[in-house]
Amino acid sequence: SSAASDVYKRQAGKRTVNRKSFNFLIVTRIMLSNLKKYQLILASNSPRRKELMSGLGVEYVVRTLPDVDESYPETLVGAAIPEYISRKKADAYRSMMKPGELLITADTIVWLEGKVLGKPEGREGAVEMLRALSGKSHQVFTGVCLTTTEWQKSFTAASDVLFDVLSEDEIQYYVDRYQPMDKAGAYGVQEWIGYIGVKSISGSFYNIMGLPIQKLYGELKKL
């Protein structure tokens, strides 16, 4: 829509960079010298994804569109779901992209016993999700899509997370204090609940935060 396009254009000049790590930025530019021909665009308002991109030491622009459709076919399971959604998010931006732009879209889900735990609907939804995760192992899948006006490629990352048994008081405290309604599975592994509740992790910690940054770095080096 024209309204969405206007929002996209207004965001075009807003560069984001970790200013405190200037020397690190210079080194990263050398290692990712192949990216000079691209303007990186992160299509996400997630504070975690912004933090991870800044930690990578690259300059990027944040651009978002309202109400991007994140539905997916019911036949998809596991890692195929966020990969499909990440590509669908990219397709929503594609008509507005210019040559030389490299769009990064991502989607993360929590996969528990064959079911998706997305973002909870309200406080009680968050409490119910944490009760379901308590004392069990689950998977976190992230799909990432890289898109230009000429090509598109996507990949996935998976992490296994084992939660200790959470008391009702711990669940209630976390939900009230941290308001995790914007997080898949109703928890942030980097927050208090991760300190006291996560017993073990197999795979990328940063994938659980929402962006498998090491894998993304590897893919960017290949361009």
Predicted segments, located by residue:
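Short Gly/charged-rich anion-binding patches and loops
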Residues: A3, P47-R48, K215
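Short hydrophobic targeting helices and cationic amphipathic motifs
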Residues: R19, F24-L25
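Anionic-ligand binding patches
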Residues: L32-I41, L76-L223
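A short beta-strand-loop structural module common to alpha/beta enzyme folds
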Residues: Y60-S71
